Amino acid sequence: MDVRTLLETTLSGLGYELVDFELGHGGLMRVFIDAPAGIALDDCVKVSNHLTRLFTVENIDYDRLEVSSPGLDRPLTREADYARFAGERVRIKTRLPIGERKKFAGTLVGLADGQVELDIDGERVAIPLASIDKARLDPQF
């Protein structure tokens, strides 16, 4: 079982969602989690303790483990995220230019037929999901 599948299965069983994970320099593993009610410090501690034991049993090689929430500007990594966060401001970067631009910011309308739809200053823009390199929430204060 690969690390992503192991994390997704384990976190789901604990009531959390794997947003993303990174394997960094020096054996650092960062795990970003979320839950419908949000994430508190106690959640991070609980998941960290559980994953530490799990990684020992599964012989996963890492030196340091960091568990945290994805933050206010969380990445959108799954198709379900585009429905969950409809109505929110987002920033999207595409792999290749679409209409001479690669960066888009607007209100997320949703996902339909493989197209992410944004409202950018009253204009609807459709971006193929497969073309998206990065997508993040863009909270406005």
UniProtKB/Swiss-Prot annotation:
Its main location: cytoplasm. It comes from the Bacteria. Keywords: Cytoplasm, Ribosome biogenesis. GO terms for cellular component: cytosol. The keyword Cytoplasm applies. InterPro entries: Ribosome_maturation_RimP (IPR003728), RimP_C (IPR028998), RimP_C_sf (IPR036847), RimP_N (IPR028989), RimP_N_sf (IPR035956). GO terms for biological process: ribosomal small subunit assembly; translation. Pfam families: DUF150_C, RimP_N. Transmembrane segments: none annotated. It is found in: Cytoplasm. Belongs to the RimP family. Required for maturation of 30S ribosomal subunits. This is Ribosome maturation factor RimP. It comes from Laribacter hongkongensis (strain HLHK9).
